[in-house]
Curated annotation (Swiss-Prot):
Chain's gene name: PAK1IP1
Basic residues: bias regions: 338-350, 358-369
Transmembrane regions: none
Protein name per UniProt: p21-activated protein kinase-interacting protein 1-like
Pfam family membership, one: WD40
Listed GO MF terms: protein kinase inhibitor activity
Length: 369
């Protein structure tokens, strides 16, 4: 298990977390990942990908602990990244594009002009057939991923900056400043609203009906999507929480938080006692201004992500081809808005992710020298 976090200082941190009594966290690598601050991170069973204000997406092979390459399709800050299974990645950026990537060959299958403004967030339905996105054009858009086209557009009163499907795919939520609107899939109508005092920075479904919410303060809150009531709240850190991640391990529900003062904390949540404050399992300080967080889970260790998605049969039939190549045909939008084939460089890289340097103590010189 690897805790991976990005920061304003352009660094990707990796910490090896080992469950036990107690849990332990040890530094694994610190990697100068980008030439600007990191803005997004996503994981699947093999890769970690990071997005940045430098407009690139960096790929890391976590099994080999090496850089795998860079995707240079977008012309704007990467705002959101999400894997579907082992075969596809979706990326969104401030250029208004959503790109669909084949992760076997790392080629762009389709590049869609999704929003007139920035793409602020996207989320893939557990079936892999639909995706939702929100942007700075005050729209919520539904995408048919089978055909790669827009299926539905809903106008919003304000710009939403987060959208998320529930694990069962029966509902989804949008976040507008400090408000969470809960939608039902079959009616596409709002069934409830949750409002907190400060701007919401991150949300995560713990179960199909329990939502973890982090605002621009130090508090994590658990809300029921059915009653919109707060089930529990606890102080995770002295500074504001930037991101939340959750997963399930051998029946144990684990929450990981990253705060702006550089702390990553791992918590144990008892779903049978959801009103109780989660217990702290371990913590580590990066001494950096963290921006994004994920947990890479090696499937060989019999762990499964809380909101994990099974690969489809079409993904299983994907042919294995070399993934790190110097050039690939990728898709782009021309000035008329039509889909075009372009040749963009996918930069291959095999540098190892380096372990943090240990400071050596200087030996005192003898006064006679």
């Amino acid at each position: 298990m690897e805790l991976v976090a990005g920061c304003y200082e352009q660094i990707l941190f990796g910490f090896a977390a080992r469950p036990g009594e107690p849990w332990t966290v040890t530094p694994d690598f610190t990697h100068h990942a980008h030439t600007a601050s990191l803005s997004a991170v996503a994981v699947n069973s093999k890769y970690v990908v990071t997005g940045s204000r430098d407009e690139s997406i960096q790929i890391y092979d976590m099994r080999k602990k090496v850089e795998h390459g860079a995707l240079l399709q977008h012309n704007g800050t990467i705002t959101c990244l999400e894997f579907y299974g082992t075969a596809h990645l979706l990326s969104g950026a401030e250029d208004g594009l959503i790109c669909i990537w084949n992760t076997k060959r790392w080629e762009c299958l389709k590049s869609i002009k999704a929003h007139k403004g920035h793409v602020t967030s996207l989320s893939i339905h557990p079936s892999g057939k639909l995706a939702l996105s929100v942007g700075t054009d005050k729209t919520l858009r539904t995408w048919n991923l089978v055909e790669g086209r827009s299926a539905f557009i809903k106008n919003l009163k304000q710009n939403a900056h987060i959208i998320k499907w529930s694990p069962d795919g029966e509902k989804y939520v949008t976040v507008i400043t400090n408000k969470v609107d809960i939608y039902k899939l079959d009616t596409a109508s709002i069934t409830g609203t949750i409002t907190i005092e400060k701007r919401i920075s991150s949300i995560r479904f713990i179960t199909d009906s329990v939502l973890a919410i982090a605002g621009d303060d130090e508090i994590i809150r658990f809300y029921s999507c059915d009653s919109q009531k707060c089930l529990c709240e606890f102080k995770a850190r002295e500074n504001r929480i930037k991101d939340i991640y959750s997963f399930e391990r051998e029946g144990q529900h684990v929450i990981v938080t990253a705060s702006s003062d550089g702390y990553i904390k791992v918590w144990n949540l008892d779903l049978n006692k959801i009103n109780n404050v989660p217990s702290l399992l371990c913590e580590v300080s990066t001494k950096a201004r963290l921006t994004c967080l994920a947990v890479w889970l090696d499937q060989a260790s019999e762990m499964k992500e809380n909101c994990g998605k099974a690969a489809t049969s079409t993904e299983a039939n994907e042919s294995e081809k070399p993934s790190a190549v110097k050039k690939k045909k990728v898709c782009g939008m021309n000035k008329s808005g039509k889909l075009t084939k372009q040749r963009r460089r996918i930069v291959p890289a095999k540098r190892k992710l380096e372990a943090p340097l240990q400071k050596k103590k200087k030996k005192k010189q003898n006064s006679s020298e």
